[in-house]
A protein has these predicted regions:
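C-terminal flanking tails of non-heme Fe-dependent oxygenases
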Residues: 1-181
Length: 181
């Protein structure tokens, strides 16, 4: 199964979970899936007092597929202000919901806050694939999810990645900048 097929199946299942037409998210994408891959190489940190975690963040993409190291922990998720280690599952693909899916689902699906903690003794690798609509595509909460009782939480935005990379380094969570006021 290729990445596009896996991605499309997952967002179709997610639409069904919300009692939406199966292709609701696919249509919001405008028929184009953008996939950006990155190879992460974390060097060991020999001195425990020098170990630095990556800053906590959510991914800008709608969904991230992550192949993580087969032997070493490092990925942690935040829930209720507590950090939980992702288990090492060789050959497993972790799936994270990102900010763009939170926007399109009008906040029903939450983007996963996470960080990486390097190992003090061994190098670690991971390969994330960030999947979402093409950058030029405007996205917003799906109309079927907006009602009088549940108004839009997020504005429609074009090129969310640009917003993400403008605010992420400042410590401001980028998705908060596109919330309705």
């Amino acid at each position: 199964m290729n990445v596009k097929t896996l991605h499309d199946k997952l967002i179709q299942y997610m639409a069904r979970c919300l009692n939406l037409e199966e292709n609701s998210f696919v249509e919001e994408y405008g028929g184009t899936l953008q996939v950006i891959s990155r190879f992460n190489f974390y060097i060991p940190c020999l001195y425990i007092d020098q170990i630095r975690t990556s800053s906590k963040h959510a991914d800008s993409a709608a969904m991230t597929f992550l192949l993580q190291d087969k032997e070493l922990e490092g990925l942690e998720f935040e829930k209720d202000n507590e950090w939980f280690k992702a288990p090492v599952l060789p050959h497993a693909i972790f799936v994270n919901v990102g900010d763009q899916m939170e926007i399109m689902s009008n906040g029903i699906f939450k983007s996963a806050i996470h960080r990486v903690v390097p190992n003090p003794e061994k190098e670690r690798i991971s390969l994330p694939l960030f999947c979402g609509p093409a950058q030029h595509k405007e996205i917003g909460p799906l109309k079927a999810l907006i009602t009088k009782d549940q108004p839009a939480i997020y504005k429609s935005v074009k090129n969310y990645n640009e917003i993400f990379f403008r605010y992420h380094p400042t410590g401001i969570r980028p998705i908060t900048t596109v919330k309705m006021t």
